[in-house]
Amino acid sequence: MGRVAIVTGGSRGIGEAISLELQKMGMKVAANYAGNDEKAREFTARTGIPTYKWDVGDFEACQEGVRKVESDLGPVDVLVNNAGITRDGTLTKMDRKGWQEVIDVNLGGCFNMAKAVFDSMRSRGYGRIVNIGSINGQGGQYGQVNYAAAKSGIHGFTKALAQEGARFGITVNALAPGYIDTDMVAAVPEPVLEKIVAKIPVGRLGKATEIARGVGFLCAEDAGFVTGSTLSINGGQHMY
């Protein structure tokens, strides 16, 4: 029987590529989503991957969502915290709601989901948790104090939880994508996009499948000695 995996935000963009990669690895994948029901149904019809709707920023919804997945597929072995939102704006223009929504989903969602699966993983002596960070959590980004703070927090969360899980066979890692050719990036005005690409040493945007391959590595059975790490996939744009 294949491992059971949950991918939050798993039916679109980078999340879709991750769901498909884990499916290709033989896992039973549950793709979480929070928005468009029609697109979620289309995703399931096209891929055979079931979708489950809940808001990862809601603690109780995460508990209930995981219970539903486990009832359908079995205990969760792999968790990929990919769901994220943006509410961009400079600090001067940002209101508290725009700050809190991003923190609750992007960082709080990692806590909520890990809390829902960690004890079960620990009791079974196996788990893979991958938290999707961002290049903007590593280097910051103008107009994204909320997003950068949340994504930066993911890296600290990852390192701390990795220490808690290590002796129970649970690895916890982060993956920090650079600028990836998704619908979100495609919406950036062309002049701005040109400036972004000019700062990427490889000279192009990344592909969602390239991020998915990195996640697949971190979720693999034989990746048990990799924990507390951040894998940066950004075309060389940010090195440290």
Task: Report the location of each language-model feature.
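Short, small/polar-rich loop/turn modules that mediate ligand/substrate recognition or access, typified
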Residues: A166, T171, V226-G228, N234
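Residue(s) in the substrate-gating loop at a strand-loop-helix junction
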Residues: S134
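Conserved glycine-rich cofactor-binding loop
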Residues: S11-R12
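Alpha-helical segment proximal to the catalytic Tyr-Lys
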Residues: D119, Q163-E164, G224
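Active-site helix of classical SDR
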Residues: A114, A150, T158
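Substrate-binding pocket helix/loop in short-chain dehydrogenase/reductase
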Residues: T90-L91, G98-I103, V185, I196
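Conserved glycine-rich Rossmann-like NAD(P)H-binding loop of the short-chain dehydrogenase/reductase
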Residues: M25-R41
